């Protein structure tokens, strides 16, 4: 998983 956006930890 990768943290991207605003505190959004999702498979980017």
UniProtKB/Swiss-Prot annotation:
<feature type="modified residue" description="Methionine sulfoxide; partial">
    <location>
        <position position="8"/>
    </location>
</feature>
<comment type="similarity">
    <text>Belongs to the conotoxin T superfamily.</text>
</comment>
<keyword id="KW-0964">Secreted</keyword>
<protein>
    <recommendedName>
        <fullName>Chi-conotoxin-like 2</fullName>
    </recommendedName>
</protein>
<keyword id="KW-0027">Amidation</keyword>
<keyword id="KW-0558">Oxidation</keyword>
<keyword id="KW-0873">Pyrrolidone carboxylic acid</keyword>
<comment type="function">
    <text>Chi-conotoxins inhibit the neuronal noradrenaline transporter (NET/SLC6A2).</text>
</comment>
<feature type="modified residue" description="Cysteine amide">
    <location>
        <position position="12"/>
    </location>
</feature>
<keyword id="KW-0528">Neurotoxin</keyword>
<feature type="modified residue" description="4-hydroxyproline">
    <location>
        <position position="11"/>
    </location>
</feature>
<dbReference type="GO" id="GO:0005576">
    <property type="term" value="C:extracellular region"/>
</dbReference>
<feature type="modified residue" description="Pyrrolidone carboxylic acid; partial">
    <location>
        <position position="1"/>
    </location>
</feature>
<feature type="disulfide bond">
    <location>
        <begin position="3"/>
        <end position="12"/>
    </location>
</feature>
<feature type="disulfide bond">
    <location>
        <begin position="4"/>
        <end position="9"/>
    </location>
</feature>
<keyword id="KW-0800">Toxin</keyword>
<dbReference type="GO" id="GO:0090729">
    <property type="term" value="F:toxin activity"/>
</dbReference>
<keyword id="KW-0379">Hydroxylation</keyword>
<keyword id="KW-1015">Disulfide bond</keyword>
């Amino acid at each position: 998983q990768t943290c991207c956006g605003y505190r959004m930890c999702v498979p980017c």
